[in-house]
Amino acid sequence: TLVVSIFLILLFQPYFLFDVGFQLSYAALFFIVWLQPMFANYWTPRNKIAQFFWDIITVSFAAQLGTLPLSIYYFHQFPGLFFVTNLLVLPLLSVIMLLGVIVMTIAAFSALPIWCIKPLEWGITIMNSIIHWVASFESFIFTNISSTFILMIASYGLLIALILWWKKKSLIRTILVLSAIILVQIILIKNKLEFGNSKEWVVLNASKKTIICQRIGNEIEVISNGLQSEEIQKNMTLQNYATGTFSAITKESPLKNVAYFNRNRILILDNSSVYLPNNQADILLLTASPKVNLERILKNNRPKMVVADASNYKSLVNLWEQTCNQQKIPFHAVAEKGFYRIK
């Protein structure tokens, strides 16, 4: 049934295959159908109330296991209190859904009385309060977990191998589990070494801000125009970059007008810069909407690339792009094309 459902949806909407919600929904459904009966067989409660909450626990655990590799890959975090949330929210959600059906039915035939709307409103308010309360325990949310697409696939391989071994233990399945564990370890070591032996200079796509990351191995230096340490720790673009490159932010520096990286001289012009004609550069970075005559700069300088980050006005970026096209110099608008990287 799940396969037919997936086939029919993708037949009409093939791009849903790349939708995060679609992937998470069907991963959760698949593992609920497959795993929940196995978990449920471990204990049979004697009364209906215990059975109700036991079903919530088994369904929650199966769904969480099924979506774990995908969640870590896309969101780089894992909620440690998902059991608590589900035990408190799901019973209330059932009541809210029932009230919602009643309200919609009455609304279809007549005007809604206030006594009919209030219980639904209170139910939603209580549910949101519970979710907010659980989310406030930030120490139980495991964040900044690095992952890659290959690691996610290998993690699913390990998960499926463990479940098959748990269902029926045998020598072949034991070897399969051990092989999957070794494969995951090899991928982790490879990723760590790959990023540890590389370096790059990246202009991030940060709206109204200039944020540059200079990564040498697994250490990142954040270069910005006034970002405080607290802001850097809370900036999701920076944290996602650090997590995605298996690295850590170790240094913070203010933005300067000249930078050097991998034999490239980078000239950075902002709204307070004064351009000198003999100030040659391989790459020109424009930030904070500087009032410069780009055509004159390009004639005197002839850089290999002109980059405009996301802190510039869109109208200026469009003018700069036209100027670069006329001068036949490559132009990269970070707000449109995404981050710019020098390796």
Description of each model-found segment:
Residues 66-74, 101, 128-139:
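Hydrophobic alpha-helical transmembrane segments in multi-pass integral membrane proteins
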Residues 87, 101, 211-213, 258:
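Conserved hydrophobic/aromatic beta-strand scaffold that supports enzyme active sites
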Residues 3, 91-99:
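Hydrophobic alpha-helical segments embedded in the membrane of multi-pass proteins
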